[in-house]
Amino acid sequence: MAAVPPLRDRLSFLHRLPILLKGTSDDSIPCPGYLFEEIAKISHESLGSSQCLLEYLLNRLDSSSGHVKLKVLKILLYLCGHGSSSFLLILRRNSALIQEATAFSGPPDPLHGNSLYQKVRAAAQDLGSTLFSDAVPQPPSQPPQIPPPAGMGAQARPLSALQGFGYTKESSRTGSAGETFLSTIQRAAEVVANAVRPGPDNPCTKGPLPYGDSYQPAVTPSASHTHPNPGNLLPGAILGARAVRHQPGQAGGGWDELDSSPSSQNSSCTSNLSRASDSGSRSGSDSHSGTSREPGDLAERAEATPPNDCQQELNLVRTVTQGPRVFLSREETQHFIKECGLLNCEAVLELLLRQLVGTSECEQMRALCAIASFGSADLLPQEHVLLLCRQQLQELGAGSPGPVTNKATKILRHFEASCGQQLPTLRLCAQPNSAAAPVGPADLLTSPVPAPGSQVFLQPLSSATVVPRSPVLFPSPNTLPPSALEEPSEVRTQLVCSSEQGTESEQRLENTDTPEDSSSPLPWSPNSLFAGMELVACPRLPCHSSQDLQTDLQKVTTEAPVSEPSAFAFLNM
């Protein structure tokens, strides 16, 4: 160094020392980009600051660490283009350490090898070629000026102008600050006047001009979504918005909703009643009274689904019934149920029933699949769906055999079974005069409610085995061969074929099995779960008759009981 920097510059340089220590730290972390600019500002402060900066960087370049050498070389390369001219002049005079760095080497690293030494040598060569190149442009002797602040207020330079609303910078126009200020105010006033003054190009004033000085509220474009009556419109009238009525003392300032139905006006007049009945009359959303809904809700409903309009339901039914396949896929069924939850389910069901008449077989099958999807969803009660679909499904089921007939029958049986309204099937082997036969009591499993006049509690009729009757008559065990008593299948065959002998055998069974005090024997239910178990006959003694059995019973009851000696001595006394 030719000259020693003054003490003032050295003290000023000490405040910037933490920046340099962070930029030339001995680690593999690269130097942050913002530190390059801060170090370049140090070189532009003064000549003494440039000397102190170069002295510090050369001392760090003389370090044995490769990471420090690489960081210092990159900083010096950046200062060649952004540093002061005095710093570059001093650096050219002290380039011995840069030449030594071009031959930097050392023991290879176990992980990276010689890559660090190669980077240091390459950076030193780039710095030397850049520092002593003749094509290097001379950097400015002063630091770059800070850009003027942007925003409201005056700029920090002479002949400045205001910035902000209504200001447009004109480079060709010159003048004093007062003239610029006045022109700015004039242009701002013109902008405000053009925004307020109604003109032919203003889209907000294309409606009819106001008559007189009376106040007319502004009309928003959202009023065009209303549904006016075509009969009340003039031929040349445009679909505009009706005038908004103001009612003081109401919520929201007393202004009516623009796109609400006429019922919203009634609800605004009777807002107290609507608040009282709103919680209890949410179910009546289709009514037009307006006392149970708020104006916003009625406006949304009137805009979404106008009254007597099922266009969305009709589009959904058309989408479902018109498809390439006969059956609905799982995705189509899920989409149909999701859309039905947002629409009127009863209207969708009625439209599906209409599709079953006069359409192709494919459309009928898809409509039936859509109707069947109501059985697996909670959109409508099963009883209500059965009530609406029963007649149509019965007519389809009674038609010519085919896939449509089978599908309609299955759906009808499914709804009847889910509602518990399936009628019991009659047996094919019943006699024509079986209507006159005594009807058996309701079975405990098939009919949970007992029939009127029947006994509620089950009581044994006699000690003997009771063989119940059924509408199908069967002979007594005495008329059957012994082999038939062992095989129940043969007994059933014999029972079906021996209908002529049924009356006599029934009388025999009543005389032998039924006690005398039982006036009305209880037959077996035809729909019982235990039907057929009476075919397994109980073995009886053929030599005994009913009179012998009664005599034996009387003897048993009349004989005195024989007391046996007890194991306890005090009981035998």
UniProtKB/Swiss-Prot annotation:
Is the keyword Phosphoprotein assigned to this protein? Answer: yes
Upper classification of the source organism reads:
Eukaryota, Metazoa, Chordata, Craniata, Vertebrata
Q: Does the keyword Lipoprotein apply?
A: no
The record's subunit annotation is: Interacts with AP4B1 and AP4E1; the interaction is direct and mediates the association of TEPSIN with the adapter-like complex 4 (AP-4), a heterotetramer composed of AP4B1, AP4E1, AP4M1 and AP4S1.
Name the predominant localization. Golgi
Name of the gene encoding the protein in the UniProt record: Tepsin
Extract the GO molecular function terms from the UniProt entry.
protein-containing complex binding
Output the Gene Ontology cellular-component terms: coated vesicle membrane; cytosol; Golgi apparatus
Annotated Polar residues bias? 217-229
Renumbered to this chain, the Low complexity biased-composition regions fall at 260-293
Q: What is this protein called?
A: AP-4 complex accessory subunit Tepsin
- Region named Disordered: 136-155, 194-311, 497-526
The protein's location, in the record's own words, is:
Golgi apparatus, trans-Golgi network membrane; Cytoplasmic vesicle; Cytoplasm, Cytosol
Q: How does it sit in the membrane?
A: Peripheral membrane protein
Function in brief? Associates with the adapter-like complex 4 (AP-4) and may therefore play a role in vesicular trafficking of proteins at the trans-Golgi network.
